[in-house]
Every structure is written in structure tokens, then in C-alpha cells.
């Protein structure tokens, strides 16, 4: 069904201010890290071409402001999303605790057709900081949260060093693609996303 | 005010008013300073040259012309140029007396003339264009009986006249430098003239940034070629073989008509100033003659406009989408009103051969001249006007910003301000002490404080760190920024801290160089812009709404386009408005723009007109490429660093004047940065904990 092929996959990155959303996006798209990113105001996105099998897609990755009071803008930015990436800082408990808010807020504002099965991916960023000594959110805790939300794929990354960023986004792209195709086929119930494939660093088998 | 209106009315009604009263036309062609003395040059002026049958064409029809007499007179060794239309002798009944008086040139001294461009085609009429040093140009003066050569020869006998090295038809008066050529070449229309590469545009910012000018002029060659390739191809009925003069005539005639319509409207409404925002009726309104003096400016303005747009877009592709015409009938032509900017206030005092400390003192002295003996700003509107039309020399910002921001009252004395500073310094220390006294133990039980501090800590270290003042590890200014923001979040606990505040504070701290003073300036700014950061985002939504109304008013096809493409929320302008273009311009330019906006000279909401100006410049790109919301957002974000400040501000000024009352009425009362309407709960609290 070539005519129905989607070529644009829209991904939204959400999470508290300063967890590294902009850095993750830039590391993935531009293979660059800077200490001088400014706080994101409003929203912006980068695009990257990705290939699956013999098909080429444009991954449109949206970076948003992290402060809660800007969430009301989400309505405009979240619509049409194919996947939502939740990011927290493994060195900040607060950023982890806020994940529920971000997830719920996204589902409300984006109002996807099938919220139960809408693909999320969780990223615990900044694993490089202080060689992990200042880490406050354990991998176990993060995975438990993922399991409770329908087995969300989980990655631990360092946007600064580049660790695992490519892997995380490959999974994100696959999830987005699957989500997009489901929408096209209008058969949301036939795909089972609920199978367990949330192993750290191994990518998702979806 | 009413006196002035009456006078102006007289002028507009009586064609000979200007001729008989030098005052009228002297002010009509008033130079930037607006202070040129109204010479009584005829009393003992010597007539040097007289030429009859010199005409201007207010419309594109050659039959419609206003003939008059061109004169050169000399008084006190200064040469003056005059052109007075013949009384009651228009070639066409359609031309009113008003038309004729519009163009009267009375005794313009050659010290204010920058150049004269001659056009002497083998066929057709000869004409000259006189360009003033302010950048204004008079409409072409047609020598129906020939004689341009003689005229120039006569001028040359009395003033230093040098032929431009770039264009042999351009004669520079008292020239010293290249900026003249810029002005001259900018007179030419790219669509009708092959513009040689290497020519440059009109100086962008009155010389305050020579580096920028150099960069601009070096880029122009490329831009010119791309403009001629694409920028004008969409213009209907464009025929490259058409004579420049016809083209010029067309342009001028459109402008003339536009000017006439606008000014007629201006006078027909109450008090003669109806189209100017009533809320500003305590401020000087652009006088009628002053506006007219800008008519001839559109040449260079338009060409710069084209360059800038093209520069922004970088894309030479020709759009095949038929973009609806701009509803402002003359589109870019109508954007010619904005006056040229002056050098920043205090600039004249700047010299390179003296130390910075003396420079500072001199700048301060310049400002001091605007104060009475006790330090009151004698005429705040004059100060605000001066800043609006040129910004402030950096050394002087520290003195002036507190007034613009409302921290200092204009009518305060030196002593009162000194007292205020000391009181406020103590008050600041007390406020700062509130959070400084929180012990680590207390902080553990004070989540809001911890989180707020954490957010501020995160943001200050990523605010303008590439800028010298804030760069490097353990930068003390970054610490000051943190302290001020944290103190502010206690001063205004309900509003707290929100991202974007550090963007505002950074230039303020850089300018004020004092923690307490910066804090109170920031407080004053937040009195107006605090609603931008409300939890309910109401201040932002109001402004975005007002912006949509202004675009609807000033560019309905673009508005309709946004409507059809689901872009009416204007979220793509969110960053522009939240931090008033801080991320769109380089640091110095941002400060220039801010001080211009903070004058509230034409409108409190000048920033919204700046938004419209930028959008308007991009309209053909946006509509031609049929951008959807995402593409538009990306496009707008990527304009950052590519917007020309000077021409944008001038466009915004033009739009603001043009919108007049209707513009003001499009903006709901209380829209930031207007002061809040009531003293109720300024910052509604919701469940957001920060």
C-alpha cells in the first residue's frame, strides 16, 4: 500500500526543565553536545531521515519547554504525535516523580485515538554525571514504573557522551512508525504492544 | 495641540501657505533633528538660479503634473533649494491644491543635501532627485525645458559637488564617506535597473554599528542578483524595459495617494489626530508635514526591504503559488513611513581618542542637558521620542533605562533618586535576607523553595553564557543573576520564577551593573510583563490574540491564510512575545529594540507591531510555500539572527501609525505590557507548585 505509506513520524520529547531534552535531540540528530544550550522557550523541532528496511522516513523530533506552566501550549504542539518520549534526570528524584504528570498531560492534550496503547519511551538521562555517584533514581525503580504503565521501553542515556542515544531513538522511531501505521489501518486493537520488551540498552523488539 | 492642528490644516488647504510662510515647508522637510531654525532666508537672500517649468508627477500619468519654479538662493554663504508650485495651475483638475502643497520645497539648505541624482535620457524628460542627508529624498523634479546640466553646474559653483565613483549620474554634496553612495544606490529599483554588484544599501542603523554596515554592504552584491531573479518576478506587469522614471513615478504616485488618503483621514477625525492612538494624546503626534517628508523615502526603504526579505529567505526559488496581494493596497510601499533612525542618544559625544571613563562622563553630560537644575526630566516625551528614534548609547543606558522602565519617576530630582536608591538598596537587602536565612535544615522541609531555587540555578547557568559578561566558570554576574531572581521570587512569591525571566534580567544586570538597581528595574519591568509568566498563561494568550487581530487588520490575506491552515493560535510567535525578541537578535540589538519598545512612544504594544512587521516581510514566503503550522514554527524559529532590526522597527512604526485607532482597538485592555487593570489577584494560583 505504497500510497498510504507515512513518511513523517512525529515524536514529542517531554520532561522537567533541565533534564536534557534539547541535548538528547541534538545528540541524536547532530551528534553534538553543547554546554551552552539555553532553556527552550516555546517549542522547536529537528528532523532526521531514518530508514527501516527499504523505506525512508522523516523523524520530526519536538523539543518543548520543560516548565510546567508552559504545558498549556501542548495542545498546539502535541497533536498528531506518533510517539512520546519521557525524559528524566537519574540524578533528580523530582524529575522522575513528575513523569506521571507529563504522561497524563500528554494524553489529555494530544488526545490520541487509542490512549491505552499510545507508545511512550522512557529515557533516564545524565548517567555520566559524577560517574553515577550522584544518582538518586535506580534502574530498578525506573523499570518498575515502566512496567506499571504498560511496559514502556526504557533507556538510560548520556546526551553528553552520547551513550545509548542512538539506540533509544531507533526504538522511538520504530514505535512511532508502528503507531502511525496503526492509525492508518484503523486497526488499533490488533497490535499488541503489551508484550514485554523493556530491557535496558537492548532496544525494543517492536 | 489644537493650535498646531489648525496651522496644519491651513497648510494643507492653502497651496501657497508654504510658499509664503517658510515655516510650513521648512517643517515639512524637517530634518531628523526637527529643530532646524526657520530661516527667514528671503529677507536678504540672493537669488542665484531660477528655472521655470520644473514639475513633479504625483501620479503615473504624465498628464497629471504639478509645475513650478525651481530656485537656488544664497544667504550667509549657505545655498538653499526651493521649488514652489505655480498657484492654480495644475494640468489636471483631479489634482487638488492639497496635492500641490504636499510637494512644496522651501529653502532646504544644501548643508542638508546629501546628493543629487540626475537622469538625462536621450528621449523623455530630464529630472533630478535630491536626497537629503537624513536619507529622505524629494520626488523627481522634471525639467520640462531641459537644463539639468546647467542646474548642476550652478550648484557646483556654490557647494562642493563630487561625482560618485559608483554612478556617474550621482553627484555627492559635501561628501566625505561612502554612506552616501549607499543612500544613492538604494534609490534605484532593482526591478528596473541592473544594479551593479558592490553597491550597498542604505545604512542600516545610522552608523551606530559600522561593522554591521560593512557586512551588509559586502553581502549586497549577492542579494541584489537574487532579488532581481526572484523577488520581483511575481510583480504583475513588470516590464524590465520600462524606463526608470516611469517606475519611479508609479511608486511615488502610489505613495502620494496613500499619503493623501491617510492624512485626509487624519484631519477628518476628531481634533485632527483621530488616527493616532487616543491614549497617547499627551504625546507629540507625528505632525502632518513631518509625515509627508517621509514620502520620498520609500525608494530606499523598499529596496532595503527587499534585500532583507531576500536575505532572510536565502532561497532563490521562484514561488509558483499565487500569493494574494497585500490588502494595504501598496504593500511595501505603505511601509515607507518609518523615519530613519538617528545615532543612539549620546552618540555624538562619542570619540575614539578618549578613555572610556571620559566617554561615559560625556554621555552622561549629554543626558544631563535634558534635565533641569534639580535633575528632573524636563520633557519626558522628548526623551522618549529621542530614544524611540535611535536608541541610547550604551554608557547612557544605565541613566536612562530606570526611567523607561518606570523605576525612576521622570519628575524626580537627583536628590529624590539618590534617596530612592538608598532606600531600595536596604529593601533589597531585606528581601534577599529572607531566602538567605533559610538554613539547610529548613530547606529540607521547604519543597517550594528548593524547587524554585533548583530551577533558577539551572537557568542562570544557561543564560547568555556565550556573552562575555556572563562567560566562564564561577562567574560573579551569574551569581548575581541567581540572587536577583531568587529574591524576586520571594518579592513576588505568587508569580515566582518562570523560564524567560533570566532572559529579561541578563541585559538589565549587564547595563545596571548593580544588584539592587538591577533588581528594582527588573521589578518595574515585571509590573508590566509579569503576566507573560502567569501560570494560566493568560498574558500570553491575550497578546497572541491581539496579534492575530492586528494581522487581520493589517494583512487580511495573511490572516485568512493562517485561519485556513489552523495557525490562528499564533504559537509560532510565542518566543518572540514571551521574551520580546531576546532570542531573535544579538545582544546589543536586543537592548536597542527593548529601549525603543520601552519608550511606549507610539504604542505600549509596539512589540506586537514588530511581530506584524516581521510576518509581513515573510508573507510571500509563508503563503507561497504553503507552510503548515509545523513548517511555519520552524521557519519562524530559524529567523533568529536573520532579522534586520532597523528596517523592522521602521516597518513596525509605519504599521503602528497606519493601524491608528483601529490598531489600538484590536488590543484588549490590560494586554501586557499595559499595566494590569485592577489590583485583584495578579497571579492566579493553580496547582502548579513552582
Swiss-Prot record, chain A:
Positions where lipid (S-geranylgeranyl cysteine) attaches: 204, 206
Record-annotated membrane-spanning stretches: none
Topology term for the membrane: Lipid-anchor
GO cellular component: cytosol; endosome membrane; Golgi apparatus; nucleus; plant-type vacuole membrane; plasma membrane
Subcellular location: Endosome membrane; Vacuole membrane; Prevacuolar compartment membrane
Modified residues (Cysteine methyl ester): 206
Major subcellular location class: membrane
Effect of residue 22 to N: Dominant negative (GDP-bound form); loss of targeting to the prevacuolar compartments and tonoplast. Inhibits vacuolar trafficking and forms enlarged prevacuolar compartments
CDD domains the record matches: Rab7
Gene Ontology MF annotations: GTP binding; GTPase activity
Record-linked InterPro entries: P-loop_NTPase, Small_GTP-bd, Small_GTPase
Stated regulation of activity: Regulated by guanine nucleotide exchange factors (GEFs) which promote the exchange of bound GDP for free GTP. Regulated by the MON1-CCZ1 complex which serves as a link between Rab5 and Rab7 protein families in PVCs and mediates PVC maturation.
GO BP terms: intracellular protein transport; late endosome to vacuole transport; vacuole organization
KW Membrane (keyword) present: yes
Keyword annotations of the record: Endosome, GTP-binding, Lipoprotein, Membrane, Methylation, Nucleotide-binding, Prenylation, Protein transport, Transport, Vacuole
Signal peptide (from-to): none
Superkingdom of origin: Eukaryota
Cross-referenced SUPFAM superfamilies: P-loop containing nucleoside triphosphate hydrolases
Role played: Essential for trafficking from prevacuolar compartments to vacuoles. Involved in the trafficking of newly synthesized protein to vacuoles. Essential for plant growth. Participates in the recruitment of the core retromer components to the endosomal membrane by interacting with VPS35A.
Family in the record: Belongs to the small GTPase superfamily. Rab family.
PANTHER family: RAB FAMILY, RAS-RELATED PROTEIN RABG3F
Subunit structure: Interacts with VPS35A.
Identification of the protein by name: Ras-related protein RABG3f
Organism, as annotated: Arabidopsis thaliana (Mouse-ear cress)
Gene it is expressed from: RABG3F
Amino acid at each position: 500500500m505504497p500510497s498510504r505509506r507515512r513518511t513523517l513520524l512525529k515524536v514529542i520529547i517531554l520532561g522537567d526543565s533541565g533534564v536534557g531534552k534539547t541535548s538528547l535531540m541534538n545528540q541524536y540528530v547532530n551528534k553534538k553536545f553543547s554546554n551552552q544550550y539555553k532553556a527552550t522557550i516555546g517549542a522547536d523541532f529537528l528532523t532526521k531521515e531514518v530508514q527501516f528496511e527499504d523505506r525512508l522516513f522523516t523523524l520530526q523530533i519536538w523539543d518543548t519547554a520543560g516548565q510546567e506552566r508552559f504545558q498549556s501550549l501542548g495542545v498546539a504542539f502535541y497533536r498528531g504525535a506518533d510517539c512520546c518520549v519521557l525524559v528524566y534526570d537519574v540524578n533528580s528524584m523530582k524529575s522522575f516523580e513528575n513523569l506521571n504528570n507529563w504522561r497524563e498531560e500528554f494524553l489529555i492534550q494530544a488526545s490520541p485515538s487509542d490512549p491505552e496503547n499510545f507508545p511512550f519511551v522512557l529515557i533516564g538521562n545524565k548517567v555520566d554525571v559524577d560517574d553515577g555517584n550522584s544518582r538518586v533514581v535506580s534502574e530498578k525503580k525506573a523499570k518498575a514504573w515502566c512496567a506499571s504503565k504498560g511496559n514502556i521501553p526504557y533507556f538510560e542515556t548520556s546526551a553528553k557522551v552520547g551513550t545509548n542515544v542512538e539506540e533509544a531513538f531507533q526504538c522511538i522511531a520504530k514505535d512511532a512508525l508502528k503507531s502511525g501505521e496503526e492509525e492508518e489501518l484503523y486497526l488499533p486493537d490488533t497490535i499488541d504492544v503489551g508484550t514485554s520488551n523493556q530491557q535496558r540498552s537492548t532496544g525494543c523488539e517492536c | 495641540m489644537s493650535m498646531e492642528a489648525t496651522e496644519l490644516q491651513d497648510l494643507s488647504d492653502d497651496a501657497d501657505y508654504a510658499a509664503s510662510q517658510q515655516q510650513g515647508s521648512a517643517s515639512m522637510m524637517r530634518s531628523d533633528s526637527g529643530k532646524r531654525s526657520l530661516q527667514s532666508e528671503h529677507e536678504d537672500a540672493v537669488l542665484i538660479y531660477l528655472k521655470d517649468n520644473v514639475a513633479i508627477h504625483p501620479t503615473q500619468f504624465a498628464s497629471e503634473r504639478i509645475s513650478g519654479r525651481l530656485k537656488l538662493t544664497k544667504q550667509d554663504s549657505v545655498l538653499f533649494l526651493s521649488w514652489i508650485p505655480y498657484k492654480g495651475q495644475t494640468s489636471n483638475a483631479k489634482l487638488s491644491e492639497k496635492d500641490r502643497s504636499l510637494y512644496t520645497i522651501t529653502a532646504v539648505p544644501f548643508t542638508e543635501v546629501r546628493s543629487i541624482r540626475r537622469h538625462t535620457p536621450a528621449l523623455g524628460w530630464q529630472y533630478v532627485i535630491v536626497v537629503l542627508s537624513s536619507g529622505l529624498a524629494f520626488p523627481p523634479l522634471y525639467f520640462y525645458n531641459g537644463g539639468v546640466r546647467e542646474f548642476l553646474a550652478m550648484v557646483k559653483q556654490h557647494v562642493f559637488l563630487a561625482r560618485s565613483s559608483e554612478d556617474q549620474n550621482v553627484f555627492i554634496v559635501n561628501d566625505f564617506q561612502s554612506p552616501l553612495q549607499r543612500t544613492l544606490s538604494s534609490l534605484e529599483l532593482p526591478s528596473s535597473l541592473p544594479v551593479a554588484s558592490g553597491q550597498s544599501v542604505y545604512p542600516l542603523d545610522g552608523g551606530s554599528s559600522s561593522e554591521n554596515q560593512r557586512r551588509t554592504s559586502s553581502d549586497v552584491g549577492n542579494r541584489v542578483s537574487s532579488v532581481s531573479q526572484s523577488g520581483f518576478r511575481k510583480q504583475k506587469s513588470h516590464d524590465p524595459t520600462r524606463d526608470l522614471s516611469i517606475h519611479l513615478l508609479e511608486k511615488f504616485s502610489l505613495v502620494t495617494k496613500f499619503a493623501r488618503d491617510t492624512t485626509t483621514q487624519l484631519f477628518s477625525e476628531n481634533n485632527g489626530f483621530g488616527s493616532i492612538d487616543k491614549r497617547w494624546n499627551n504625546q507629540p503626534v507625528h505632525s502632518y508635514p513631518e509625515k509627508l517628508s517621509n514620502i520620498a523615502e520609500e525608494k530606499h526603504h523598499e529596496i532595503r526591504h527587499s534585500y532583507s526579505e531576500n536575505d532572510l529567505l536565502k532561497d532563490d526559488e521562484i514561488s509558483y503559488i499565487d500569493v494574494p496581494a497585500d490588502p494595504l493596497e501598496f504593500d511595501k510601499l505603505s511601509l515607507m513611513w518609518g523615519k530613519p533612525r538617528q545615532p543612539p542618544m549620546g552618540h555624538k559625544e562619542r570619540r575614539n581618542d578618549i578613555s572610556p571613563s571620559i566617554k561615559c562622563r560625556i554621555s552622561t553630560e549629554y543626558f544631563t542637558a535634558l534635565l533641569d537644575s534639580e535633575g528632573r526630566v524636563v520633557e519626558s516625551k522628548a526623551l522618549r521620542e529621542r530614544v524611540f528614534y535611535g536608541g541610547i548609547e550604551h554608557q547612557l543606558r544605565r541613566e536612562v533605562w530606570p526611567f523607561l522602565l518606570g523605576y525612576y519617576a521622570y519628575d524626580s530630582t537627583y536628590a529624590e533618586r539618590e534617596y530612592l536608591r538608598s532606600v531600595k538598596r536596604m529593601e533589597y537587602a531585606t528581601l534577599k535576607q529572607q531566602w538567605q536565612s533559610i538554613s539547610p535544615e529548613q530547606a529540607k522541609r521547604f519543597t517550594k523553595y528548593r524547587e524554585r531555587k533548583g530551577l533558577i540555578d539551572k537557568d542562570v547557568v544557561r543564560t547568555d553564557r556565550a556573552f562575555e559578561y556572563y562567560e566562564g566558570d564561577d562567574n560573579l554576574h551569574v551569581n548575581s543573576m541567581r540572587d536577583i531572581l531568587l529574591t524576586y521570587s520571594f518579592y513576588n512569591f505568587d508569580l515566582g520564577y518562570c523560564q524567560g525571566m533570566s532572559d529579561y534580567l541578563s541585559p538589565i544586570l549587564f547595563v545596571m551593573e548593580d544588584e539592587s538597581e538591577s533588581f528594582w528595574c527588573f521589578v518595574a519591568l515585571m509590573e508590566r510583563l509579569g503576566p507573560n509568566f502567569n501560570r494560566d498563561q493568560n498574558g500570553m494568550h491575550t497578546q497572541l490574540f491581539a496579534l492575530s487581530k492586528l494581522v487581520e487588520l493589517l494583512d487580511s490575506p495573511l490572516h485568512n491564510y493562517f485561519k485556513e491552515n489552523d495557525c490562528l493560535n499564533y504559537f509560532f510567535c510565542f518566543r518572540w512575545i514571551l521574551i520580546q525578541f531576546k532570542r531573535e537578535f544579538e545582544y546589543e540589538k536586543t537592548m536597542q529594540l527593548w529601549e525603543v519598545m520601552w519608550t511606549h512612544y507610539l504604542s505600549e504594544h509596539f512589540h506586537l507591531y514588530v511581530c506584524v512587521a516581521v510576518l509581513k516581510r515573510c508573507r510571500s514566503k509563508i503563503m507561497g510555500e504553503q507552510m503548515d503550522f509545523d513548517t511555519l514554527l520552524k521557519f519562524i524559529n530559524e529567523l533568529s539572527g536573520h532579522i534586520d532590526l532597523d528596517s523592522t522597527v521602521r516597518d513596525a512604526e509605519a504599521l503602528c501609525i497606519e493601524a491608528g485607532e483601529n490598531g489600538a482597538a484590536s488590543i484588549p485592555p490590560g494586554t501586557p505590557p499595559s499595566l494590569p487593570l485592577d489590583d485583584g489577584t495578579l497571579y492566579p494560583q493553580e496547582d502548579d507548585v513552582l
